[in-house]
């Protein structure tokens, strides 16, 4: 789905407060930043994640992104363990700006609070409001 010129794939779930996309596969989730989220951040030059094997809770900072104008700490409604980190994105963070839905950041195995995530059809109003605020 397109929202104000930004792509939001229908098959993903979203945590709109953090501008995070989530792909759910059984008890595994793959996590990245939305196209609008990367636009709002600007050119991303650093990605820092928890280590593989570390436990996470909904209060844990799972990863941090840095751009020239912003530092963002990301949390998710998930309890589990980091099972994979996209080393390519950590080494070359601008991949998030170039292809945000290919440039996943971490994979987590555990209990995702799916009721806290939204399909794009339910998140569209939030994304529309945020996009209108940042597009000039």
UniProtKB/Swiss-Prot annotation:
Residues 28-109 form the Lipoyl-binding domain. The modification N6-lipoyllysine is found at residue 69. It comes from the Archaea. Its cofactor is (R)-lipoate. GO terms for biological process: glycine decarboxylation via glycine cleavage system. Binds 1 lipoyl cofactor covalently. One of its GO terms (cellular component) is cytoplasm. Coiled coil: none annotated. Keywords: Lipoyl. The glycine cleavage system catalyzes the degradation of glycine. The H protein shuttles the methylamine group of glycine from the P protein to the T protein. PANTHER family: GLYCINE CLEAVAGE SYSTEM H PROTEIN, GLYCINE CLEAVAGE SYSTEM H PROTEIN-RELATED. The glycine cleavage system is composed of four proteins: P, T, L and H. Belongs to the GcvH family. This is Probable glycine cleavage system H protein 3. It comes from Sulfurisphaera tokodaii (strain DSM 16993 / JCM 10545 / NBRC 100140 / 7). The gene is gcvH3.
